[in-house]
A protein has these predicted regions:
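Transmembrane beta-barrel architecture of outer membranes
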Residues: 7-13
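An active-site-proximal structural segment forming one wall of the substrate-binding cleft
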Residues: 123
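Outer-membrane beta-barrel architecture
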Residues: 15, 112-114, 118, 173-175
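Surface-exposed loop/interface segments of Gram-negative outer-membrane beta-barrel transport/assembly proteins
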Residues: 2, 17-108, 126-177
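Outer-membrane beta-barrel channels and translocator barrels
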Residues: 21, 118-120
Length: 177
């Protein structure tokens, strides 16, 4: 729907069940998910700027004062800027999507394992563990022509943010039937 946008997802799962002996069994599952999102999407500025509203309210033509090409090449509607309020109420949605690079990538690994031992008939011990790690990276760059660069004195800027979340759990269960 939007220019300069996209989504990609890759998933994988591996499951392993093995009876090691008459009384001992091992189970494991490994999951992998990678997602990549590109573009500003339907909202930017943490929801304060609604791209769909900008598309619906954008002037379709330049009218008598501008050619259509001039209107399409401006980041902010010139009539909005002429009143002196420096209002960014009407941003050109085409120019905005072309002028913002917003890439979000997330990679998640998850591993579960369990070892079950039937000590005697009716008495079972099970130890299980889970390990999860998620790596995130967000690259945002506001080029000349974006409303963010306009607010920054018409100077482009950007940022990169990376994060990692790691979780581990373990449980041991003794069951008597």
């Amino acid at each position: 729907i939007f220019k300069n946008s996209g989504f990609d997802k890759t998933t994988g799962k591996f499951r392993f069940n093995q009876k090691l002996s008459k009384d001992l069994s091992f189970d494991a599952t490994i999951n992998y998910v990678q997602t990549t999102r590109e573009g500003v999407g339907t909202s930017a500025d943490n929801g304060r700027f609604n791209m769909l509203a900008q598309i619906l309210s954008a002037r379709p033509t330049g009218g008598l004062r501008l050619t259509d090409e001039e209107l399409l090449e401006t980041a902010i509607d010139p009539e909005m800027l002429e009143d002196g309020s420096e209002s960014l109420a009407q941003v050109n949605p085409v120019k905005q999507t072309e002028s913002v690079t917003n890439n979000k990538r997330a990679e998640m690994w998850s591993a579960n394992g369990a070892l079950t031992w039937e000590i005697i008939k009716g008495l079972t011990f099970k130890t299980a563990g889970t390990y999860n790690t998620t790596n995130n990276r967000i690259d945002i760059f506001y080029k000349d022509g974006s409303k963010e660069a306009y607010r920054n004195g018409q100077k482009p800027y950007g940022r990169t943010q990376m994060g990692r979340d790691v979780r581990w759990s373990n449980n041991n269960t003794l069951t008597w039937k």
